[in-house]
Amino acid sequence: MDIRAIVCDVDGTLLTSKQVVDEKTVASIKKARSKGILFGICTGRDADSVRNHMKSWGIEGCIDFVVGSGGSEIDDYILNLYQENHTLSPDLIKEIMNHYKDMDCNFTICHEGILYAPKDDDYIRNMAEGDGIEYRVVDFDTFLTRPYRKLMIICNPSYMPQIVERSQAFKNKDYKASALVTTSFLYEYMDPHVSKSSGLKEALSLHNISMSQCMAFGDEDNDIDNMK
């Protein structure tokens, strides 16, 4: 088996319940890299927040590249390269939010390692605390002046079926977006061209590595296409 790269999701896979990487895992990563195998992170988190957490997770200096925001970002530490692909327009984000405005949920957009939300509640507070990320409550009419990589809907896990059901009624003839349950409490909207596998394929191609030469680990629906 010609494995030239290993990639791993963050939450529920790479991190323990204490929000660190186990010492045995770190040792395995270092051993693989010593043999010339690249180690990357493929996550729904944005690339900035991953970079900001390397030290606290205990993997500083162990990462070669990050595929962030579900596949729309590539942050390559070897090539010192960053690129962002496929965003959602401000008008589309507003329309999506309006579609769920009467429901028990909140919305958030992660930008430059910070979670931005239109209101303060337990949903955004718990998410920020769990991920160890700063959050800010802002006026989204003012905030949404540029495209963003994705919009996240936060809700109670028991309420997720209702969010998914409502999503089936969302239609827009001018814009396209795809949506996916990424954790028990997160429902995410992204450009339909975005997926972890497409982002990973592009990141690997920068090093002339094929998908068949990559071993991937994950635990959620958006990790499945990486493992096919």
Please report, for each region that a protein language model flagged, where it lies by residue.
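Asp-based phosphoryl-transfer active-site loop
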Residues: D2-Q19, M227
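Short loop/turn microsegments at loop-to-beta-strand junctions
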Residues: D2-R4, C62-I63, F217
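Hydrophobic packing within well-folded, soluble alpha/beta domains
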Residues: I6, I29-A32, F39, L200, ...
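Conserved Rossmann-like nucleotide-cofactor binding loop
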Residues: T13, A47, N222
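Active-site phosphate-binding/coordination module
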Residues: E23-Y123
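Short active-site oxyanion
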Residues: G36-G40, D64, K150, S212-Q213, ...
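Conserved acidic, metal-coordinating active-site core of Asp-based
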Residues: H99, M103-N226
